[in-house]
Amino acid sequence: MMKMRWLGAAIMLTLYASSSWAFSIDDVAKQAQSLAGKGYEAPKSNLPSVFRDMKYADYQQIQFNSDKAYWNNLKTPFKLEFYHQGMYFDTLVKINEVTATTVKRIKYSPDYFNFGNVQHDKDTVKDLGFAGFKVLYPINSKDKNDEIVSMLGASYFRVIGAGQVYGLSARGLAIDTALPSGEEFPRFREFWIERPKPTDKRLTVYALLDSPRATGAYRFVIIPGRDTVVDVQSKVYLRDKVGKLGVAPLTSMFLFGPNQPSPTTNYRPELHDSNGLSIHAGNGEWIWRPLNNPKHLAVSSYAMENPQGFGLLQRGREFSRFEDLDDRYDLRPSAWITPKGDWGKGKVELVEIPTNDETNDNIVAYWTPDQLPEPGKEMNFKYTLTFSRDEDKLHAPDNAWVLQTRRSTGDVKQSNLIRQPDGTIAFVVDFVGADMKKLPPDTPVAAQTSIGDNGEIVDSNVRYNPVTKGWRLMLRVKVKDAKKTTEMRAALVNADQTLSETWSYQLPANE
């Protein structure tokens, strides 16, 4: 009997020992906090010049051998592939696998890669490393693994859901964006990826962030689906004071659209990864800010307490809006951030940077807190990131939203029925929504409008749009000084009931 008791105790002890070990964000946070207390050491590149100086076309030739995907021989729906170092991805990133009992470094091997026509000395690459990784999952078809996550460059990552193609990017952290001192780009220097079980439908990734003035520990839980959701937890530590901290940053591209048409003839009516910033403020207000490609750097701030959500969206999915068979902007996802817990007082900030082509990301959006702790103190941020093509789902059904913003030369119809330009700028704003569609066409919908000191609203009228079953606002505004920006706001109401989100537009200077 005593022998059986000892045997039972031994089994219980074994179970306890095996279940008590678990890798967590706290393990990464210890490293981040330790780094924050030390001086910053810039990463050193170990790349041969043939890789460091290569052009993008050459870098694209270095392809991962898909038959050597990590976890290929395991019964798990997730697979990993890796990015080779090259071009400006010139420093190695450590990548580890976390199992139920241990942490193991995933070792680099040139055998993972096909180098194409890139001429190189095989001896010089044998001790290199990875620049990042991608996650594959059968998201569109059960018998085909598609790339759903890409972690490459600084703290950038891209995510897609079913039927989507890569568009905008998310980042771990942004520092001093759009400040005269220049932006600092933190980087993920090491990753830990949990080996998923055969039945797992989610993948957990940990990351250690480092930069001259900040460190951080991150936990990403990736849940693929029609909308792919990433659950994010971060613990951030400042090494030194920063001018501005950008939390949950998103990076996108806007070249032109109907609110700011292409200056040259283009068969594509619109060209952008996102066309607006959507905000659900702490007080419940919904705000829509159409994006611009300004001639000068522009920063817009929306002060609030405890934001309920914000994101860069791609509203309007018809192929006819883009007409691009190669880059399929109509399939690029919107990204929506839902904070968890109270984020306190701060601002959702939008940065718009001039660009001449679509290869440059020129749009940044993030949350920046009003108060930052002293260096070394921990900051915690939790939020979900949803990548979706279903923009209706990212908005309250009882609140109509802006379907499109179109800009035109303002004019007045003469007695001879010919339209004559009158020196104004016209805006056509279409509002739609689930509840709005139920309103009778003769509902007395009106607009509440306002404009900043640099402009004057010459005319404002609202009419029912039978095509969209929504309402169309038509504005004519006169700008006083074209060298300055002009701010406008509008929302639809029915008596004392607000029917729509707030259209918040900035007409760029020198337009």
From Swiss-Prot:
Pathway annotation from the record: Glycan metabolism; osmoregulated periplasmic glucan (OPG) biosynthesis
Tagged with keyword Translocase: no
Location(s) in or outside the cell: Periplasm
Signal peptide (residue range): 1-22
One Pfam entry name: MdoG
Coiled-coil annotated residue ranges, if any: none
GO MF assignments: carbohydrate binding; catalytic activity
Superkingdom, natural source: Bacteria
GO cellular component terms listed in the entry, alphabetical order: outer membrane-bounded periplasmic space
Gene Ontology biological process terms in this record: beta-glucan biosynthetic process
InterPro entries in alphabetical order: Gal_mutarotase_sf_dom, GH-type_carb-bd, Glucan_biosyn_MdoG/MdoD, Glucan_biosyn_MdoG_C, Ig-like_fold, Ig_E-set, MdoG_OpgG
Keywords associated with the record: Periplasm, Signal
Similarity field: Belongs to the OpgD/OpgG family.
HAMAP family hit by this protein: MdoG_OpgG (MF_01069)
Entry function: Involved in the biosynthesis of osmoregulated periplasmic glucans (OPGs).
Protein's name in the database: Glucans biosynthesis protein G
Organism: Salmonella paratyphi A (strain AKU_12601)
